[in-house]
Curated annotation (Swiss-Prot):
<keyword id="KW-0132">Cell division</keyword>
<keyword id="KW-0472">Membrane</keyword>
<dbReference type="GO" id="GO:0005886">
    <property type="term" value="C:plasma membrane"/>
</dbReference>
<keyword id="KW-0812">Transmembrane</keyword>
<comment type="function">
    <text>Cell division protein that may be involved in stabilizing or promoting the assembly of the division complex.</text>
</comment>
<keyword id="KW-0131">Cell cycle</keyword>
<dbReference type="InterPro" id="IPR034746">
    <property type="entry name" value="POTRA"/>
</dbReference>
<dbReference type="InterPro" id="IPR050487">
    <property type="entry name" value="FtsQ_DivIB"/>
</dbReference>
<feature type="topological domain" description="Extracellular">
    <location>
        <begin position="43"/>
        <end position="272"/>
    </location>
</feature>
<dbReference type="InterPro" id="IPR026580">
    <property type="entry name" value="DivIB"/>
</dbReference>
<feature type="topological domain" description="Cytoplasmic">
    <location>
        <begin position="1"/>
        <end position="21"/>
    </location>
</feature>
<feature type="region of interest" description="Disordered">
    <location>
        <begin position="253"/>
        <end position="272"/>
    </location>
</feature>
<feature type="transmembrane region" description="Helical">
    <location>
        <begin position="22"/>
        <end position="42"/>
    </location>
</feature>
<protein>
    <recommendedName>
        <fullName>Cell division protein DivIB</fullName>
    </recommendedName>
</protein>
<keyword id="KW-1133">Transmembrane helix</keyword>
<feature type="domain" description="POTRA">
    <location>
        <begin position="43"/>
        <end position="115"/>
    </location>
</feature>
<dbReference type="Pfam" id="PF03799">
    <property type="entry name" value="FtsQ_DivIB_C"/>
</dbReference>
């Protein structure tokens, strides 16, 4: 105890052991709470037990390989590593960004924001990858067989962009079933598309209704089989009906075959 300048008595706490102990106790409690929080965040006793990868096109194994994340990895290695994995895929042309979340049960959840592949376009006997915005790759690359090739479209045209949007809106099973998309306008249908399917059928549709109408495709194929038609035309422009190939359809397909043979012969000649 001491006297103030006004003659009043004051209590000094700087050397008071009781107050010092209380301050030390609260400091220790805060540090211990932070330690526990860090411990439960890193979970050094736990491993990654399961991985879940959400993609639109990419195979989940591709993503895990690029990130180098595996079941059995220590939990702490991946805790709070969202920015780290994004640095790993910074120059990857297929991925825009990744998000990583770890659940308390040891599940690593990865969500992928992809640069989608809409298909491939041939220019001067070289193939180029086309993304969801109709932008072409700077380097030539062979089609992957998982997305269609686009024929007779003008680069960057509205009809091309609408077609890409419609194609990417289709169910995954149906997207994989399409081998080629042709811009095939006729007087009665100026926006007509012709889709060459992997099963040998030809589909006519419009970009505005393509994604919705393609859901009818399996039923229409079944109808064709009931009629004894192995391969034919499924017209989805104004409803949905199936028929046999006609001369106009054969001419369309034969012209495509002719173009392919010409381009292949040119490329073989240029390589000699």
């Amino acid at each position: 105890m001491r006297l103030s300048s006004h003659g009043k008595k004051t209590v000094s706490t700087s050397n008071n052991p009781v107050f010092n102990r209380i301050g030390l106790f609260f400091t220790a409690a805060i540090l211990f709470a932070l330690f526990l929080q860090m411990l439960f965040f890193l979970r050094p006793w736990q491993d990654i037990k399961e991985t879940k990868v959400y993609t639109f096109q990419m195979d989940y194994r591709q993503v895990l390989k690029k990130v180098d994340l595996k079941v059995g990895d220590p939990y702490w290695r991946w805790a709070g590593q969202g920015q780290t994995i994004n640095r790993r895929i910074k120059n990857d042309s297929m991925i825009r960004s990744l998000s990583l979340r770890l659940s308390k049960n040891g599940t690593a959840i990865i969500r992928v924001n992809e640069n989608l592949t809409a298909g491939f376009v041939q220019i001067k006997q070289k193939w180029y990858r086309m993304d969801q915005n109709a932008h072409l790759s700077s380097k030539s690359i062979q089609p992957d067989g998982k997305t269609p090739v686009y024929t007779d479209f003008k680069n960057g045209s509205k009809i091309l962009k609408k077609t890409i949007t419609a194609y990417l809106s289709m169910d995954k099973v149906m997207r994989l079933a399409v081998a080629q998309i042709i811009y095939s306008p006729v007087k009665s249908s100026p926006n007509r598309l012709a889709l060459v399917m992997n099963d040998g059928n030809l589909v006519y549709a419009n970009p505005s209704s393509l994604a919705k109408r393609m859901d009818l495709y399996p039923k229409m194929v079944a109808t064709m089989e009931e009629k004894g038609i192995k391969n034919g035309v499924i017209d989805l422009q104004y409803g949905g009906y199936a028929r046999k190939f006609e001369n106009s359809d054969d001419n369309l397909l034969s012209s495509l075959s002719s173009d392919k043979s010409k381009s292949s012969s040119k490329s073989s000649n240029s390589s000699k």
